[in-house]
Amino acid sequence: VNPKDFKKTMEVLEKIGKVDHHLVHEHHGMAWVDGVTVEPHYKVHNYQSPPTDYAMQEMFASVFPSELSSADMDGYAVPVFPPTFESVFLISHMVNHVYEEGLGLRQVIDYAMFLSSCADKIDWLQHHEYLHLMHMERAWRIFTCICVDYLGMSLPSQVESFSHQEKVWAEKMMADIMRVGNFGRGEYVFHHHGFKDAFNNYCWVAKRCWNLGFVCPSEARWWIISKVKRFFWKKSFKK
């Protein structure tokens, strides 16, 4: 959604469904229409490191809408991003989950399915350039290693074999996925009812950034800084 149209979009959704105005995130709102969750994005995604965030917004602008293709799903034409961008976006989305609410196995499976189907369609030189700009080369290697070593995906011919250190990182990340899971449901669930909840939420994020900083060091560092604003400053502002 174009940022200038976001308010109007939410008004339309409120007429045909339910909108939770307290769940407006840093890049999207939340609504439910006929039992289906709808996330109107006014920004493709939000990253904590300013250079990483800038790189993604520039990459997104370069492919949307001019580079979209169309895929048929049950007779409906669905817009699809170029495979190169899609791969990098999936990786970056997983990184976000790692440092906040937890990464789910289903998200890694999504990437394994995507890579199994689209590896030959990716422009790998551009892919590496995108990852470099996002500071996410290591995260990509770790997630791809999990796909190969734990999910049984064949190593794409375009991807180099993994080092011992990468396998160690993948094992640690996989252990966290199995223990914590998507949105932290296996270990911790965010609550938003006062300062104590804000403090507990922040401690959870800071601990994850410390323990899993190896996945994407630049984002881990910035999460610790930026979430002070999200969990405390906004809470004080509302009061």
Regions found by a protein language model. Give the residues of each.
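Conserved NTP-donor binding/palm subdomain of two-metal-ion nucleotidyltransferases/polymerases, i.e.
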Residues: 2-239
